[in-house]
């Protein structure tokens, strides 16, 4: 029978000093012997997705203590990728994921916590906490802050829905007047919560549902809606139940590694492909799988991407639907239900509610249940009122969206495409693969051959795009922006946004060893592995080289002979695999990240051979 980890510091005469300190935190005599549960919060005033989380830890803690546990809250850092975008701050975004994972491990292990509730929301925070949960393998429940409402404004007397990407794109479009840019800026992000489309933050919070580590509705219920409060209350109660089952009943099936098995990772990836999620999720799932010691690789992603259809298109892949519309259509349980009916889901994986994922679908899929409470839950909608307060409104749609032919979520029969929303491409320029969000690619450019134009940094690429160097037919190469080469593997949202703003969104391709924001769409191919700094072929491309991209056949080729590439490689070996003439100040923290980082196909995690 497992014993409470916290007994190390709460039991026995020799722990009198530790107990004295525990008492100073508010613990009483009868608290010693109860499970100590870490409430891992990520409140910060820097990030709209986290600005409302200050009081969430208290909500969870009250439920933990009422159910018989002891709650102890601490905070992690949180980086806002949108605010860090387009300058040196973006170099810190991906490394913050690993720092978050480490900080959670440090706090939980230093204080011998027995379990944890992870309160996350935005891009690197959910993955960092997920990596920590897999690493620690103690009972854990995830509950996120929720998505913000979509922005709305009138342009040319027409009401349109907006998000962060619209503000970025229109600001670079010289045909849009200053007044319209101002109106968009002031309307794009109206409430607290993670940005309103299927960007990285919302994608990851949806995937925790598929992994079985969060509650139904976690990925889609709006941050502002009163119904979201119940997710936090339930998380607090449920973590105590998981503690009882593990520590009192010796039931290891409640542990994260027992829930997030390889089958669960496949479910999460299938969901990601079906909903056209952010390409960053590939990076983070690979990293979490390594922490869980699950053999889940790019080969599995490639296999799944060839058979899972695209069942939902949400911003940035369309301006018609945002996360509030996904929720109205039944949320993640509805998409998983369609995958189950298409025989594309492992229905027997477990969840933190003690059910199988199949049992959860039967209970929460709006097309299967007539339960009025479930339908009411998924009718929760936006209020259209600017606010930074959670649970501040109780607006509801009149009906749910259960139209699986033309609605936000489709059945396999009426899928947006039988080919999924994400694809892995391989070829001589990406021997270990690269990733493209096919849900955001226009059908006219699924096959594309063009001339390379090479940039050694994101900044140089932005200057080239806005300066008129990039023309229709170009394949824009941005290299030395991978985990090592950046270092930090910054996102390339500005280059893709600017290509669209100058009318080249369907006329060019972009290939990088860096990564893309969840807000990216178009023929934008990232995670090219091996990266240039590791001797990848992308480091050998020269201006004017032909590159052939064939998404249907999952191929990407540099049309240069092997003999010529061998000559170039020898020359580059002599020079060293570094960007030419790039001026970039790199801190010691970033140098350390780059030194240990693997390429994107390994999740950009630490290379253990260097430890």
UniProtKB/Swiss-Prot annotation:
Cofactor(s), by name: [2Fe-2S] cluster; Mg(2+)
GO biological process: isoleucine biosynthetic process; L-valine biosynthetic process
Gene3D superfamilies: IlvD/EDD C-terminal domain-like
GO cellular component, one term: cytosol
Residues that bind [2Fe-2S] cluster: 122, 195
Alphabetical list of InterPro entries matching this protein: Dihydro-acid_dehy_C (IPR042096), DihydroxyA_deHydtase (IPR004404), DiOHA_6PGluconate_deHydtase_CS (IPR020558), ILV_EDD_C (IPR056740), ILV_EDD_N (IPR000581), IlvD/EDD_N (IPR037237)
Active site: residue positions: 517 (proton acceptor)
A GO molecular-function descriptor: magnesium ion binding
Known EC number: 4.2.1.9
Pathway where this protein functions: Amino-acid biosynthesis; L-isoleucine biosynthesis; L-isoleucine from 2-oxobutanoate: step 3/4; Amino-acid biosynthesis; L-valine biosynthesis; L-valine from pyruvate: step 3/4
Alphabetical keyword list: 2Fe-2S, Amino-acid biosynthesis, Branched-chain amino acid biosynthesis, Iron, Iron-sulfur, Lyase, Magnesium, Metal-binding
N6-carboxylysine carried by residues: 124
Catalytic activity: (2R)-2,3-dihydroxy-3-methylbutanoate = 3-methyl-2-oxobutanoate + H2O; (2R,3R)-2,3-dihydroxy-3-methylpentanoate = (S)-3-methyl-2-oxopentanoate + H2O
Family from the record: Belongs to the IlvD/Edd family.
PANTHER family: D-XYLONATE DEHYDRATASE (PTHR43661), D-XYLONATE DEHYDRATASE YAGF-RELATED (PTHR43661:SF3)
Assembly, per entry: Homodimer.
Function according to Swiss-Prot or TrEMBL: Functions in the biosynthesis of branched-chain amino acids. Catalyzes the dehydration of (2R,3R)-2,3-dihydroxy-3-methylpentanoate (2,3-dihydroxy-3-methylvalerate) into 2-oxo-3-methylpentanoate (2-oxo-3-methylvalerate) and of (2R)-2,3-dihydroxy-3-methylbutanoate (2,3-dihydroxyisovalerate) into 2-oxo-3-methylbutanoate (2-oxoisovalerate), the penultimate precursor to L-isoleucine and L-valine, respectively.
Protein name, per record: Dihydroxy-acid dehydratase
Source organism: Actinobacillus pleuropneumoniae serotype 3 (strain JL03)
Gene of this entry: ilvD
